[in-house]
């Protein structure tokens, strides 16, 4: 007997449609101004570091697609109790990463690339485990792409060099992250 569910079909369609709409105008419609500014700075950092506009656009687009898809899964109550526990673990680890990133920026010369790399890698691994039963291999690739890109030790070192070319971008990102933490969004 064929199992058909209009709810499942609607969710798949929603994920598919939203994944194709990860343009800047759509992002601004779906997220708040602070998050949009952070994404813009992440794009600038990626572009400056890689020297490749296309790669910078791709990594931010992948980030948006992943966030949207996980949001759709959450909104449609697709996660089991075990997965919701993983989601809480991810949220805690992400919060820890955000607070560490802010601290490293606020107190110059405290940056430790091994710590940041480990936090980002842990976030990636928890997120992959969370969505392993729900997303495609292509989405797993997007998750790896985003986290591997931003956990690159050279990128992190350039980013956290006080007075370096990426320092103003980092300052804007940390100001935005601070605002999101204060608002209880992170």
From Swiss-Prot:
One CC-aspect GO term: cytoplasm
Keywords of this entry: Immunity, Innate immunity
Domain topic, free-text comment: The central region was initially thought to constitute a DED (death effector) domain. However, 3D-structure data reveal a previously uncharacterized fold that is different from the predicted fold of a DED (death effector) domain. It consists of a large, hydrophobic central cavity that is poised for cofactor binding.
GO process terms (BP): innate immune response; regulation of apoptotic process
UniProt xrefs under PANTHER family: TUMOR NECROSIS FACTOR ALPHA-INDUCED PROTEIN 8-LIKE PROTEIN 2 (PTHR12757:SF4), TUMOR NECROSIS FACTOR INDUCED PROTEIN (PTHR12757)
Superkingdom per UniProt: Eukaryota
Protein name per its UniProtKB record: Tumor necrosis factor alpha-induced protein 8-like protein 2
One Pfam family it belongs to: DUF758
Described function: Acts as a negative regulator of innate and adaptive immunity by maintaining immune homeostasis. Negative regulator of Toll-like receptor and T-cell receptor function. Prevents hyperresponsiveness of the immune system and maintains immune homeostasis. Inhibits jun/ap1 and NF-kappa-B activation. Promotes Fas-induced apoptosis.
Keyword field contains Cytoplasm: no
Family listed: Belongs to the TNFAIP8 family. TNFAIP8L2 subfamily.
Name of the gene: tnfaip8l2
Residue ranges crossing the lipid bilayer per the database entry: none
């Amino acid at each position: 007997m064929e199992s058909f569910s209009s709810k499942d079909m609607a969710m798949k369609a929603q994920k598919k449609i939203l994944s194709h709409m990860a343009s800047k105008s759509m992002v601004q419609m779906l997220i708040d101004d602070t998050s949009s500014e952070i994404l813009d700075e992440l794009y600038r950092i990626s572009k400056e570091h890689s020297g490749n506009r296309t790669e910078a656009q791709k990594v931010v687009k992948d980030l948006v697609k992943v966030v949207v898809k996980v949001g759709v899964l959450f909104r449609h109550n697709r996660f089991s109790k075990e997965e919701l526990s993983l989601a809480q673990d991810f949220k805690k680890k992400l919060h820890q990463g955000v607070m560490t990133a802010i601290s490293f920026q606020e107190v110059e010369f405290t940056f430790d690339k091994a710590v940041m790399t480990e936090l980002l890698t842990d976030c990636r691994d928890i997120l992959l485990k969370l969505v392993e039963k729900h997303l495609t291999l292509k989405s797993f690739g997007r998750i790896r792409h985003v986290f591997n890109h931003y956990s690159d030790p050279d990128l992190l070192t350039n980013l956290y060099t006080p007075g370096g070319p990426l320092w103003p971008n980092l300052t804007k990102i940390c100001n935005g992250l601070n605002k999101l933490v204060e608002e209880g969004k992170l």
